[in-house]
Curated annotation (Swiss-Prot):
Belongs to the GrpE family. Homodimer. InterPro entries: GrpE, GrpE_coiled_coil, GrpE_head. Keywords: Chaperone, Cytoplasm, Stress response. This is Protein GrpE.
């Protein structure tokens, strides 16, 4: 190989080397753009997920707050129910002939009015009495204490020993009830 040919080859090699870095640089920049686009998409998804999670957390906290407000009187209401029960028992214990006595009549009327006012106040705060007598036994609302022979269908509440109450949609106290059972002379039909 002559010296001229060597110079020519060296020039070609030098020229091809100078072209390769540009091509390599272009390939790297294309890969870099793709990487950045992929990272951008991932960050967008992460941002959307974070926003959705924050919104769900906000909704859950608002619901918990409203429930806390609605049910904040639960303990106090249970205590007041025992007062209402005692007033009912006191009135029930007074014989009818004494209720008619002029000296006691106004006292009895005052106790009855106080009991009604107490129940009205409880109702204003979402506390309602559970209707039991004549209803089918519902274990979510009633606590069966005894079975009583009755002509009513089996499982029907025939006696209420203690009233049950709900606060909004939750049970505050179950009603203690007596439930009908078939009379001893009757046979069960299958």
């Amino acid at each position: 190989m002559t010296e001229e040919q060597k110079k020519y080859e060296d020039a070609e090699n030098l020229e091809s080397k100078s072209e390769n870095p540009e091509e390599a640089s272009a390939e790297k920049s294309e890969n870099g753009v793709e990487d950045l686009q992929a990272e951008n998409e991932k960050l967008k998804k992460d941002l959307l997920y974070s926003k959705a999670e924050a919104q769900n957390t906000r909704r859950r906290l608002e619901k918990e707050k409203s429930e806390a407000i609605a049910y904040s009187v639960t303990g106090f209401a249970r205590d007041m129910l025992s007062v209402a029960d005692n007033m009912e028992r006191a009135l029930a214990a007074i014989p009818d002939d004494i209720k008619q006595d002029e000296k006691i009549k106004n006292l009895v009327t005052g106790i009855e009015m106080t009991g009604k006012e107490l129940l009205n106040i409880l109702q204003r705060h979402g506390i309602k009495r559970v209707e039991s007598v004549g209803q089918k036994l519902d274990p979510n609302l009633h606590q069966a204490m005894i079975e009583i022979e009755s002509e009513k269908p089996e499982g029907t509440v025939v006696q209420e020993m203690q009233a049950g109450y709900t606060i909004h949609d939750r049970l505050l106290r179950p009603a203690m009830v007596g439930v009908a059972k078939a009379q001893s002379g009757e046979t069960k039909s299958a």
